[in-house]
Amino acid sequence: MKLSKKLFDEIIYTVKISPYESGGFVGGVTDTVTNVVYDSKNSYFASYIPDNDLLNDSIRTWAKNSIEFLGMFHTHYPNCASMSLGDEKFISELMKNICDENDILYFPIVIARKEISVYAAKLINSKCEIKKDELILLG
């Protein structure tokens, strides 16, 4: 996944003032994030639950400007860079419900409000495969 240094810094700054397990949505073109929407409605101690209305509104608004929905991000506590079983289950269900075969969505995890670890999910033969992805900072 590609992300400008400016957006990287914006995400890190914004989540510093948000509770852990908060998140948002990323949009852009192919594998390059150009837009971020922060979701502050549903933050809980141990999990991030996206605001479906905000997500759907974001997707509709982006579509009018040829911006694709690329995925969701959320924050984790320090020393927790990997996906939880809950994360994997949520992503698998999401992929099966909204994606076509071979679609890829990205699920960045912001760790300790200072770094970003990216995972890519792909639907192959109706099964969701989640793999660590490289974060490429642009500019």
What is each stretch, according to the model?
Residues H74-H76:
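Histidine-centered divalent metal-coordination motifs
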Residues M1-F69, P78-G139:
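Conserved beta-strand-loop surface patch within small alpha/beta domains used
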